[in-house]
Amino acid sequence: MKRKVFEMQNKPEIDAFDTRILAELQADARLSLAELGRRVHLSQPAVAERVRKLEAAGVITGYRATVNLAALGYGIRALVRVGRADFARMSRFIDESPEIVNAWNVTGEDSWILEIAVVDVEHLDAVVSQLCLLAETSTSIILKTLRQHQVMLPRVKHMKEAAA
């Protein structure tokens, strides 16, 4: 039995320095280039060039602040699984709904998984009621987040074809 080889298509060349840069920026995107260079043992201009190349290659796609939604008044977060729904109507609903924090179009029994943030149960009911006009839904309130924003680095070793 042969194992399948999994490789990323159009994978940019990423070396150990780039990997360390990615780890540092994912942990703290506010690092200055000087501090980033100090941490990865490169000069500031060298780090700036590597970051620019990672951005140009689409490896780094943006920088953002992570906020505490509860501190902003959104006391409830929920995952809403949505059955088959018209793609254009769902896309429009997602675009027009500020409560939707993340939205994924997925395979399987559900067509969409939405992460929403709402003020209270009444607000949750209002959002889900609107979604129910588009498709069947199933809602789970998030009790606790155990992992958020996992640092991801390039794969070092690829699976090799091997006879089992």
Where are these regions (language model features)?
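A compositional/biophysical signature of low hydrophobicity enriched in polar/charged and small residues
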Residues: 1-164
